[in-house]
């Protein structure tokens, strides 16, 4: 695709098509991203990190300026508009400049930029707690040395860094900085070309690939990290495989699923509130869908929203579309193709297409 640059016309089509899907599909993206807070807890690899996560979350909120400055100091947050789990910097670079500004503004308005930076600041704080805890190793954790080694650190590096006032300018400080960067990159989704198929980097396919990046990145970064840790523990304790691996799997579930539950609840309250606020729709019990679910259905819903299917979520969504009488092909071809398909299916019922697909917020209610 580098030998065949994107034509100006196709660039505009891609840009406006993507922007339309941003404003119609992602108004609740910040709420849906709450599960991102589980990443640093999972990467901390021990059940005690759940308690530490609550403490660090409170500390990040309370000392926001300090947390933000530390994140900038180690290079995981910049003052520029950030990419998020739903759209990468590379995808933004191929957008029409006017549409990109509008997209950036939209993500600021819905709070996604703020939340993306906040999760990175939280992850940086969790990283400091992680390396400090395992450098001191007060409870003689046999895995502590390995945990630090995986970040390119030793116990001596971290303790010397602490004794020197946690300055990043010392040789140990530079190693700690790189180690914390590795921790954050293993905790927070920051999609890039390495986390998607080769064809997905071609801007000609932007409308087909749109909104699929999250599932690939979650599988590679979070689920891949869990898998690697489980395999390592299996090699360390081959005679007790269940005991060796159950902890990391349980931690992943316990850290993620309550956040998915909270996200679903907040989404339903947000929809109900908007229905009360906006003309033409009424608030009511219909927006609290989870209240009508039985336990198996609710657990399945939360499992889906936790992201545990990874990239398999894409063909599964296509299968669900087929169950509802829609074409799974258009689901695989992306939300823009689904919009076109729905418009043709509705024909002259333009009002239905507007309400169900094209009117931001209303199409979610």
Where are these regions (language model features)?
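Non-transmembrane, interaction-prone alpha-helical and coil segments associated with secretion
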Residues: 1-201, 234-240
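Small-residue-rich, membrane-active alpha-helical segments
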Residues: 30-70, 74, 78, 82-90, ...
